Amino acid sequence: SFMNNKIMKKRVVVSLGHQALGYTTLEQRDAVQITARALADLVEAGYQLTITHSNGPQVSMIHKAMTELRRVYIDYTPAPMCVCSAMSQGYVGYDIQNSLRAELLSRGISRTVSTVLTQVTVDPYDEAFYEPTKIIGRYMSRDDAETEIKKGNYVIEEPGKGFRRVVAAPKPIDIVEIEAIRLLADAGQVVIACGGGGIPVIEQKHALQGASAVIEKDSIAGKLAGDLKADQLIILTSVPCVYKNFGSDRQEELRSLTVSEAMAYREERQFGEGNMLPKIDAAIAYLNVCPQGSVLITS
């Protein structure tokens, strides 16, 4: 019967957005406890769970702390973006796995929850590297911005607020640790992987070189769900469902969509570039690999 149970279990990939994690260390601890209850409900209902998460506020906080450290200690080398990303995976993963483990134990479920530090390969010639768009870190003065530009980094000005660093958001190619993630998932474990989109790396012979970039967390959630042949991808966000004419007086709920309908609305530019569009693209990419699957985009 054990094998039957294993086959019966529906595999779900859940992607957690900022609102599921909070913006500061204390906010995160509280937010994660609420999120853990929802995740535990899925485990209790018999789903095999793989979790991925955003790390926008966390990676910015770490990047800012490392940059400030450099100001105080001149000899200190600032941490590159890929190292900040690795730190955020550990820190967010630690909070999620402990909260979820405790929540499961309180329900009498003994299940290992583990975080897999995940790297994702990207193409060094990805056009995103020539046109960085992802804003990270704190506001800077003009002097600081000029220093960043001299270092070869990209900076944009937000009128009246200051300057901010922007990095590339290349497309994910391969999840390096996918076999480890798959083995844990197949063994019925709860896995946290590809946090913050994964650490972007470029293959150089046998070595993996960290890239100064971040991967869109929604696109990696779609890739992960496809690679694991998940039955469902759940993308948690700040709105209850997908809308057309979002934010206008003609706003309309889209409670269910086929891939072709989603593609048609996409052509009409119905989905916001920075928020809903990457989620729709992730859904389409996953469903192209797993046509029997389904995607839930909700709060």
Language-model segments: which ranges?
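Polyanion-binding loop/helix "lid" in catalytic or ligand-binding cores
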Residues: 30-38, 80-99, 103-104, 168-185, ...
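Short acidic, glycine/serine/threonine-rich loops at helix termini
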Residues: 24-26, 60-65, 125-131, 203-205, ...
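Ligand-binding beta-strand-loop-alpha-helix segment within the catalytic cores
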Residues: 69-191
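Glycine-rich beta-alpha junction loops
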Residues: 117-124, 196-199, 239-241
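Short beta-strand segments at enzyme active-site cores
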Residues: 13-15, 48-61, 112-117, 191-194, ...
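A glycine- and small-aliphatic-rich helix-loop capping segment at beta-alpha/alpha-beta transitions
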Residues: 28-33, 65-76, 129-138, 205-213, ...
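Acidic, metal-binding active-site segment of PIN/NYN-like and related structure-specific nucleases
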Residues: 230-248
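N-terminal glycine-/serine-/threonine-rich phosphate-binding loop
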Residues: 3-52, 61-71, 183-188
